[in-house]
């Protein structure tokens, strides 16, 4: 039983050593020469997620809530978030 425990520890130590990152690997990744702006696709929640009209505005509203807005709706396939934040709406109703 002791031999299995020792072999297991040696195996785990070998795996940990092999999985450790090498410092030289990260040097080229840290220097970005030319950063490009990422494209924003506002139609994903309204077009792709509302397949055959099953999700509709709820995916857009959930996306807007995750952005800190008070909800949203789909308008011609584009997700339109409310201007007010969720905190402002909460304070207006309950605060």
UniProtKB/Swiss-Prot annotation:
Pfam families: Defensin_2 (PF01097)
Propiece residues: 20-43
Keyword Signal among UniProt keywords: yes
InterPro entries: Defensin_insect, Defensin_invertebrate/fungal, Scorpion_toxin-like, Scorpion_toxin-like_sf
Tissue expression: High expression in head, hypopharyngeal gland, and mandibular gland. Low expression in thorax and thoracic salivary gland.
Listed transmembrane segments: none
Superkingdom of origin organism: Eukaryota
Subcellular location: Secreted
PANTHER family linked to this entry: DEFENSIN (PTHR13645:SF0)
Protein name: Defensin-1
Organism field: Apis mellifera
């Amino acid at each position: 039983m002791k031999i299995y425990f020792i072999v297991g520890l040696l195996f785990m130590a070998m795996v940990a050593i092999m999985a450790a990152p090498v410092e030289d690997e990260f040097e080229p990744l840290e220097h970005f020469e030319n950063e490009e702006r990422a494209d924003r696709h506002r139609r994903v929640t309204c077009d792709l997620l509302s397949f055959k009209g099953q999700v509709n505005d709820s995916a857009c509203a959930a996306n807007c809530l995750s952005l800190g807005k008070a909800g949203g709706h789909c308008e011609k396939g584009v997700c339109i978030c409310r201007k007010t934040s969720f905190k402002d709406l909460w304070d207006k109703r309950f605060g």
